[in-house]
Amino acid sequence: VSVSAFIGRVDGTQSIRPIGASNDADGTFFGATAELAFAGFRLGGSVVRDHSSADTSRVLFDGSEATSHYRLRGTTVDVHAGYGFAIGGGWDIGPEVGVTYVSVKRGDAAETGAGAFNLTVAKDRLSYTFLTADLALQMSEGKLRPWLSAGLRQRIDNDRVEATASLTGVSASFTVAGVQRDRSFGNAGAGVAWQASPGLTLFARGNSEFGSDNNAQSVDAGLRFRF
């Protein structure tokens, strides 16, 4: 059994093609993990807190661009299980399944750049639960351990995304449906971990999600302390 704590920096982007919008976020994350490995089986779980800020831009009907800046606070809880088949040279490959719960609190935001069409958007909270099935290739021996994974992710809940906003200079507000995450989408990731000492590991990883209406990419790096 291995228990560890970690801290690092994250940078992510999201594009929403149907409405010509994009999100760019960066910040600090920290959390803890627990892992159990035996006879090729891997069981694990993690809890992550994310303190980030984001910038959103959207293109209006007349070609002008509205931008806004706001705060993001997130919590992610993940449980996963997998099995690795040894293929030689310290590498193993095998399936991995998991359940991930994500809760995000978005701060309020005031747009600029669109004149009378600028929006002031109220803060909100939303959550998702996902099922994930991946095929993972990883180095299981040595101090330097790269890995690759690819698979599918399925959203299993129906938390409706809504946004409440008002136009500049208008006191009345309105609520509209927001952009919902795709129910099913592809997921690919890669990373590397380097064991600098028995209790300290440096890691870096990247992840991409590919859906029918929105795509997302993220890169993070940090330190993991093993107890």
Label the model's feature ranges.
Residues 1-93, 203-226:
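Outer membrane beta-barrel translocator domains of Type V secretion systems
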Residues 3, 7, 120-227:
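Outer membrane beta-barrel transmembrane domains
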Residues 96-102:
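Internal active-site segments that recognize and position negatively charged phosphoryl groups
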Residues 37-39, 88, 115, 138-142:
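Short strand-coil-strand connectors
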Residues 84-86, 91, 104, 146, ...:
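Hydrophobic/basic alpha-helical segments enriched in Actinobacteria
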Residues 13-24, 52-71, 103-127, 156-184:
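Solvent-exposed, glycine/polar-rich loop segments of beta-barrel outer-membrane systems
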Residues 79, 97, 131-135:
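Internal, well-ordered alpha-helical scaffold/interface segments
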